[in-house]
Amino acid sequence: MSIDWITVAAQIVNFLLLIWLLKRFLYRPILDGIDAREAEIAARMGEAAAVRQQAEARETEYEARIAQLSSSRAELLEEARRAAEAERDALLSKARARLEEEQAERAAHRAEEAARHRADLQRRGAEALLALTRKALRDLADEGLERRIVLQAAGRLADMGDDLREAAGDARQAVALTRDPLPEEVQARLRSDLGDVLEGVSLRFEVDPGQSPGLNLRLGGAQLGWTVDSYLNGLEATLAEAAGRPARRGGHDAA
């Protein structure tokens, strides 16, 4: 059997031509489409990677912001807690100070009330004692007590010379007022002692049964008293001064 090489060669040429034609007109567009698709896929994958990177960057940024916000929130909460504690401490301190102030005011008020009460009791006691003493001296006083008071007053006239002369002025007469009539020798002693201080001034004796036992000497526009009441008034003034309150005003006391 003989081979027709011309036919074989023609078949080979036809096959190669077919391959070329297939590659040229069929496979090339397909390959180009595949390449384009792969390029598109690669581009989209690149875009996806970029998007993923952006997303990861955003996520990292958001996480950082969240962490910062959490830190800021914690700092704000801590600052708010410290501020609340400081305000609470300030309010408690203010309340304690106010309470201590009110307690001090109440204590001072109680002490003041107690002092006022004691002073009132002392005043009432002193007034009662003075009233009883005044009544007792009035009831127990006799001519002998009044005579001794007058003699004591007469002995003090010399020490009161300047005051007596100023009180007398141009007056030429003095009045000695007692509760009971004085004995002649007592009148003479008082007249003599007054004359030694005030020359030319006469002395007249008068009696007032309602007067406190002792001597009231009227001279010009002045009156000097050495009576039981005047002594008690002086004692009352001393007690009132010691108690820090004004004394009741009475006649001039020369005791």
UniProtKB/Swiss-Prot annotation:
InterPro entries xref list: ATP_synth_b/b'su_bac/chlpt (IPR002146), ATP_synthase_B_chain (IPR050059)
One Pfam family hit = ATP-synt_B
**Which parts pass through the membrane?**
5-22
- What keywords are assigned to this protein? ATP synthesis, Cell inner membrane, Cell membrane, CF(0), Hydrogen ion transport, Ion transport, Membrane, Transmembrane, Transmembrane helix, Transport
Q: Name one GO molecular function term.
A: proton-transporting ATP synthase activity, rotational mechanism
Membrane topology category: Single-pass membrane protein
What range does the record give for the signal peptide?
A: none
Q: Where in the cell is it found?
A: Cell inner membrane
Q: Name one GO cellular component term.
A: plasma membrane
Q: What does this protein do?
A: F(1)F(0) ATP synthase produces ATP from ADP in the presence of a proton or sodium gradient. F-type ATPases consist of two structural domains, F(1) containing the extramembraneous catalytic core and F(0) containing the membrane proton channel, linked together by a central stalk and a peripheral stalk. During catalysis, ATP synthesis in the catalytic domain of F(1) is coupled via a rotary mechanism of the central stalk subunits to proton translocation. Component of the F(0) channel, it forms part of the peripheral stalk, linking F(1) to F(0).
PANTHER family linked: ATP SYNTHASE SUBUNIT B', CHLOROPLASTIC
Q: What is known about its subunit structure?
A: F-type ATPases have 2 components, F(1) - the catalytic core - and F(0) - the membrane proton channel. F(1) has five subunits: alpha(3), beta(3), gamma(1), delta(1), epsilon(1). F(0) has three main subunits: a(1), b(2) and c(10-14). The alpha and beta chains form an alternating ring which encloses part of the gamma chain. F(1) is attached to F(0) by a central stalk formed by the gamma and epsilon chains, while a peripheral stalk is formed by the delta and b chains.
Identify its protein family: Belongs to the ATPase B chain family.
Q: Which HAMAP family match?
A: ATP_synth_b_bprime
Provide the protein name. Answer: ATP synthase subunit b 1
Q: What is the organism field in this record?
A: Dinoroseobacter shibae (strain DSM 16493 / NCIMB 14021 / DFL 12)
